[in-house]
Amino acid sequence: MKIFIQNQQDKVDIDQHISKIIEESIVNTIKVFLEEENFEISVLIVDNSFIKELNRNYRNVNKETDVLSFPIFEFKNGKLLEDIVIMEDEIPLGDIVISIEKAAQQAKEFGHSLEREIAYLTVHSVLHLLGFDHIEEDDRKVMREYEEQILQSMGLTR
C-alpha cells in the first residue's frame, strides 16, 4: 500500500508521529474492508483557509471543515460497485484533505489529543472513500460503529 502525505501549511507543526498515525489509521481502516493491499491514498495536510476554499469549490459550502474526501471509485459501505481495470501496480482509492488547524481546535474543544483527533478524521475520511456516509441516521450509526471499532483497535478511545 502506498500512502503519500504532503504538508501544505505552517500553522501546526507536523512531525513523524502525526504522519505515522495517519498511515496507521489508513491501514487499519482499509484492512477491515479490503483483502488486497495494493492501494494508494494521498493525504494533503492544510490550514483552515485552504480547506474552506476546497469546500466552497467542490461542495458549495463556504466555510471551513475538518476533512474532505475525494474518492476515485464508487463504493457502498466498503464494497466496490464497479468493475475496474487498472494497469498500474497500485489502485488509487482517492485523496484525503485534512485541516490540521481545525483538527487542533477540535482536539482542544473535545478534550483529547491532537493524535486522537487526526486518527479519527483519517478513519472517517477513509470510510468516505469506501462509500460510507452519515446523511441518514442509520448510515451514521453504522459509520460511527466502524470509526469506534477501528480507533479502539489502535488503542485510541475517547
Swiss-Prot record:
Which PANTHER family did the record assign? ENDORIBONUCLEASE YBEY, CHLOROPLASTIC
Subcellular location(s): the record lists: Cytoplasm
Chain residues that bind Zn(2+): 124, 128, 134
Principal localization reads cytoplasm
Record key words, sorted = Cytoplasm, Endonuclease, Hydrolase, Metal-binding, Nuclease, Ribosome biogenesis, rRNA processing, Zinc
Q: What is this protein called?
A: Endoribonuclease YbeY
Supply one GO molecular-function term.
zinc ion binding
Cell cycle as a keyword of this entry, yes or no, is no
The protein's required cofactor(s) are namely:
Zn(2+)
Source organism of this protein record: Caldicellulosiruptor bescii (strain ATCC BAA-1888 / DSM 6725 / KCTC 15123 / Z-1320) (Anaerocellum thermophilum)
According to the record, cofactor stoichiometry and binding are noted as:
Binds 1 zinc ion.
The catalytic activity of this protein is classed by the Enzyme Commission as 3.1.-.-
Name the protein family.
Belongs to the endoribonuclease YbeY family.
Q: Its gene?
A: ybeY
Q: Name one Pfam family in it.
A: YbeY
Q: What is the documented function of this protein?
A: Single strand-specific metallo-endoribonuclease involved in late-stage 70S ribosome quality control and in maturation of the 3' terminus of the 16S rRNA.
GO CC entries: cytoplasm
- Biological-process GO terms, alphabetical: rRNA processing
Statement: the UniProt record of this protein carries the keyword Cytoplasm: yes
Alphabetized HAMAP family for the sequence:
Endoribonucl_YbeY
The cross-references to Gene3D superfamilies, in alphabetical order and at most eight, read: Metalloproteases ('zincins'), catalytic domain
